[in-house]
């Protein structure tokens, strides 16, 4: 006797497969309707997109994207966040948890050239640590357009242990849309709670006023 559940599952799989096949057929039919002029327009558009992306990558690399580097002063921090649209900054001290974070940050810096990945020693940047309320180390400040948009504090959101994967950290950073991410994890759905934002530009002005 056939298993009714199995039959239902098979029907669902066939339905999905048929829908995908129909979609592909429609796309092929659309392409077949294009004449040479239409194809040339698509080709030119694609070339422009590729050229624009190549120019972006060249600029990102010139700014230090693609590698995980250390910021040695608070002044340099402000220069970095003003130069790059997206920055992930690791506030650290010389301890094991921060070294674990360093390992994952180094990997992500190479994978996400669109974002600048840096670190700064918290104890040597007291103004920033106080202004951004950095208490637990490691803490990642996720920065967009000079604003600290979100934080990853310690390992609590990464399973609470130091054996989390680079993908776990990647997904967490992607929630703040500080990196481009093509994954399908449900954890990337935007949070409903309002994130506290601190304007780094305001911090920079305050820093200048305190001198």
Swiss-Prot record:
**Regions of compositional bias (Polar residues) in chain numbering:** 184-203
Region feature Disordered, mapped onto this chain = 184-211
The segment(s) forming the Thioredoxin domain are 68-178
InterPro entries assigned to the protein according to its UniProt record, in alphabetical order: Thioredoxin-like_sf, Thioredoxin_domain
Instruction: Enumerate the Pfam families for this protein.
Output: Thioredoxin
List the Gene3D superfamilies.
Answer: Glutaredoxin (3.40.30.10)
**Disulfide-linked positions:** none
Tell me the protein's name.
Thioredoxin domain-containing protein 9 homolog
């Amino acid at each position: 006797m056939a298993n009714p559940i199995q039959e239902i599952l098979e029907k669902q799989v066939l339905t999905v497969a048929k829908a995908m096949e129909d979609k592909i057929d429609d796309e092929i039919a659309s392409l077949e309707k294009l004449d040479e002029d239409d194809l040339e327009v698509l080709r030119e558009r694609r070339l422009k997109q590729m050229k624009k992306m190549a120019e972006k990558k060249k600029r990102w690399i010139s700014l230090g994207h693609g590698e995980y580097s250390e910021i040695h002063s608070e002044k340099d921090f402000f220069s970095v966040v003003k130069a790059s649209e997206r920055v992930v900054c690791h506030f650290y001290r010389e301890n094991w948890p921060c070294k674990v974070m360093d390992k994952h940050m180094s990997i992500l810096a190479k994978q996400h050239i669109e974002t600048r990945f840096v670190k700064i020693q918290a104890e040597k940047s007291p103004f920033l640590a106080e202004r951004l309320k950095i208490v637990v180390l490691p803490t990642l400040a996720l920065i967009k357009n000079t604003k600290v948009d979100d934080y990853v504090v310690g390992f609590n959101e990464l399973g609470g242990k130091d054996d989390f994967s680079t993908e776990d950290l990647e997904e967490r950073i992607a929630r703040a849309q500080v990196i481009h991410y093509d994954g399908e994890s449900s954890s990337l759905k935007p949070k409903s709670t309002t994130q506290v934002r601190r304007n780094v530009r305001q911090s920079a002005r305050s820093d200048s006023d305190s001198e």
